């Protein structure tokens, strides 16, 4: 049994992410995902910050376990946007088909985004001395024009 990963809980959380439209520029959906991720990290005792570089693309999320340190030992980077238009989440919500999990953004990259919370839980419990920084951007699918400098 892995104390940092529970498949049932992971799939429940993944359904929230996948069933939220978050195509690049879908600010409401990206903001919902950003808030969800920030709560997950805050629940682990991490510092979080929402960063908006362009209002029309939505926020990015930064989470750290040693926020006062300028050094980073472990950097996890991902994105919250997808290529799918508004309405796709309702048309194709998360489904589990045997060992396959399907839905808009399930593989790229909402499962990876959520997996960062499992890795953060591990670091917090097992290697708290490591300076962990997690960055989720809002515009990767169009080349990260607003978050690139971050």
Please report, for each region that a protein language model flagged, where it lies by residue:
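Acidic/histidine-rich catalytic neighborhood of metal-dependent amide-processing enzymes
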Residues: 109-150
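Acidic/His- and Gly-rich active-site-bordering loop/insert found
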Residues: 2-104, 125-128
